[in-house]
Amino acid sequence: VLKKCLPLLLLCTAPVFAKPVLTVYTYDSFAADWGPGPKIKKAFEADCNCELELVALEDGVSLLNRLRMEGKNSKADVVLGLDNNLLDAASKTGLFAKSGVAADAINVPGGWNNDTFVPFDYGYFAFVYDKNKLKNPPQSLKELVESDQNWRVIYQDPRTSTPGLGLLLWMQKVYGDDAPQAWQKLAKKTVTVTKGWSEAYGLFLKGESDLVLSYTTSPAYHILEEKKDNYAAANFSEGHYLQVEVAARTAASKQPELAQKFLQFMVSPAFQNAIPTGNWMYPVANVTLPAGFEKLTKPATTLEFTPAEVAAQRQAWISEWQRAVSR
């Protein structure tokens, strides 16, 4: 009888020993095998006595869209991959809780003052090109848009992608009320508009375009991983739009303490050291940058709207973009 009962007893007691699961919504390139996700998962699990589950979506704006849809029933404990341009919209959902992370642990351009969203990296949007193929890259956003050069361009959709939203705001900074006409001109050079960064960059690497919307730090991947220095970010005279990527814990999380622990871990060297050569962005903590980063384009001017300005205008600017590119 005991032999028969023993397996049943083990089955009944197994869940007692199950590790708690922390569910993190993020974007696909973060969670990918070649992204920082696997390294970060391993480091956090070694410390937390838990299981870290990364749920990958296409891009940062998709994360917010998904969370809005799921509301308080979301399985997400942490959302990682929103950015400075989505702060106001994300705050207004009421779905996030205060982080408990001290602002002095964070070093980003312009400083940081937000008790809910915690930066984990930052970078500057840029158009990346292959120096072997494109000998005369544009020197400004205006040249990219207005030149009669037949450059083929790929960028991301501002409704689903944070780089896409970044370009929308960059255009707005440079062109203001003339942005719709600029979008119409750029549409003539646009090969496609993708839902997320990974798809766009993949198409560019296959030779589908001359320029792709990415980051000033993207060439570091090719320099360090592939030992190739033929990829570069075009340095635009008007300046480059800043992106600060953030994470936050959800108010409805079933694992609030673990979620807070993860946000604290996020600004530690164990996480931050995985950023330069995993996410190919700048870290927010004082960690040593790998060789190769000194070769990267450094924007002379940083462009940025406040989160409140973005929240007030984002929908109108997206509608303008839609009308302009569909003509």
Where are these regions (language model features)?
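Extracytoplasmic ligand-binding site segments that recognize negatively charged/polar headgroups
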Residues: V21, Y25-G37, E58-S62, K75-S209
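Short alpha-helix C-terminal cap/hinge motif
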Residues: P38-L54
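A ligand-binding cleft/hinge motif common to bilobed small-molecule-binding domains
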Residues: N85-A89, L205, S209-N230, N279
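Short beta-strand->loop
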Residues: F96-A103, D115-P119, K142-V145, L211, ...
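Periplasmic-binding protein-like
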Residues: V108-P109, G123, W183-A187, V193-T194, ...
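A bilobed periplasmic-binding-protein/Venus flytrap-type ligand-binding module shared by bacterial periplasmic
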Residues: A126-K133, Q172, Q243-Q255, A274
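Mature extracytoplasmic/periplasmic domains
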Residues: T250-T306
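Extracellular/periplasmic bilobal clamshell ligand-binding domains
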Residues: G292-R327
